[in-house]
């Protein structure tokens, strides 16, 4: 029985080849949590468990297919050092699909939350990484230029942690200037939602741009900023397969 348990444990935490290649390509440390995990940052604690082997293999393929769309220079510009993959990831006890730990230059991603929807998990890869970009740029939550694009009567909520209800991330054309209910929760979430859906739901976003001048202006500002932040995120990127 002991031998069997050890064998199962080894299989449970084996690093999928696709994640190994991500680490090599982007010069980042990629880890899979292999025991109950806890890390405390400035005012918050992240906890996670070991993912099941089948969940890990499935997620690793999805994650790698999305991450490989980024130019190597973009990951360096974001100052990302580590990617940690786990299950049941929580931030101060609140379950999360992913968490950016800014002071640790680390991204955490959950293999199982939302795994009923591949498009959702794909979008999360980009949404949460964008927070890292925004933080490096110094405009995560205070962004007067972005806020000025909204209608005068528009007001954001008190943050994404306050909006965790099912369906908050569903695309809708019922909200002028934003893509989802979740985007209304905070300026940082508005930007991240737009970036994530540009990469995963490009046709939908372009359709909204034609009918909503605020969204069109936000896309223009977002792309312009990204091009200045990293020269590889340019028109050629957005017109390539990687950007679509």
What are these regions (language model features)?
Residues 30, 41-43, 48, 63, ...:
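Generic alpha-helical secondary structure signal
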Residues 8-57, 157, 161-172, 188-190, ...:
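Non-catalytic architectural context of zinc metalloproteases
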Residues 82-244:
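Active-site-flanking segments in enzyme catalytic domains
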Residues 1-8:
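Hydrophobic membrane-insertion alpha-helices, especially the h-region
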């Amino acid at each position: 029985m002991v031998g069997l348990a050890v064998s199962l444990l080894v299989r449970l935490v084996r690093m999928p080849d696709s994640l190994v290649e991500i680490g090599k390509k982007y010069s980042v440390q990629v880890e899979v949590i292999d025991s109950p995990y806890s890390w405390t940052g400035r005012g918050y604690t992240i906890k996670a468990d070991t993912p099941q082997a089948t969940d890990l293999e499935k997620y690793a393929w999805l994650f790698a297919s999305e991450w490989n769309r980024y130019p190597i220079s973009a990951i360096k510009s974001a100052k990302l050092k580590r990617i940690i993959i786990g299950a049941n990831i929580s931030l101060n006890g609140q379950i999360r699909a992913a968490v950016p730990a800014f002071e640790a230059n680390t991204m955490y991603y959950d293999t199982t939350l939302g795994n009923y929807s591949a498009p959702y998990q794909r979008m999360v890869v980009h949404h949460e990484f964008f927070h890292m970009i925004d933080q490096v740029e110094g405009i995560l939550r205070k962004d007067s230029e972005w806020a000025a694009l909204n209608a005068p009567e528009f007001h954001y909520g008190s943050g994404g942690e306050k909006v965790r209800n099912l369906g908050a991330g569903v695309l809708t054309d019922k909200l002028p200037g934003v893509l989802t209910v979740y985007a209304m929760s905070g300026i940082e979430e508005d930007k991240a939602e737009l970036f994530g859906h540009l990469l995963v739901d490009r046709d939908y976003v372009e359709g909204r741009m034609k009918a909503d001048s605020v969204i069109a202006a936000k896309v223009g500002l977002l792309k312009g900023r990204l091009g200045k932040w990293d020269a590889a995120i340019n028109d050629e990127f957005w017109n390539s397969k990687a950007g679509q």
